[in-house]
Amino acid sequence: MLSTAPAQAAQHQDANEYAIWNFHGATGFWNIDQRVQITQKANHSYWAMMWDFTATPGNGGYMGLQTDGTRFNHTTGDTAIFSLWNANAGRGSCGPFGGEGTGLSCRLAYAIDRQTDYRLRVWRLNADTGGQWWGAWIRNMKTGVDTAIGSLRVPRNQTLLGVPSNFSEYFGTAVACDKVPQSVAYFTQPAANAQGNGTYRYGSTYERSTRGRCTGGNVRLVDLGRTKAAKVTLGGR
């Protein structure tokens, strides 16, 4: 029997660009902060900071901003996201995810302004009998408003973060590799373990980049004056 249901378009694969940072041997952080500014948006795109837990290499989480993101209240649009693999509880607008492992994700509507930079923050919270809690916030650096994305609990041994990296990804409908919609994001040098007054125990420098096999793009280190940033261009030829 032939189905009369419309065929679902395939999702694009391998359209990503990664920026890798060097903390010069330091690892095991209870906090990581980083700013991002998305100066050119594209549909169905994700700009994120990601990390592993030192106790479980290859297993960690990510946070960032998406266009056309799907939220747990069944709405879509610009979205702030915080996700941890193997999370067992959440506080906020959170729910399960799958496809690339399993865990929990917190998602909320959050408008992306191309003229504004945002501080991404992940921070270790309290522990309880069920495990270790982590929280994520996004701050609009123009208004100074901090917004909590949510809190997630992971197994008790996941108490420290490894060195972070960044990625820009297109996750929309499959297109030709040279037709991936172009986006541009600036990720500043991430820093760890905030000491107050804008200072940190650990800083980083840009190391290298990698790109998926089905997209154009590049990463360039640029000097912003107060800091440097990885300018991540994804898509195009």
Which residues are covered by each model-predicted region?
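Aromatic sugar-binding interfaces of carbohydrate-active proteins
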Residues: 130-219, 224-227
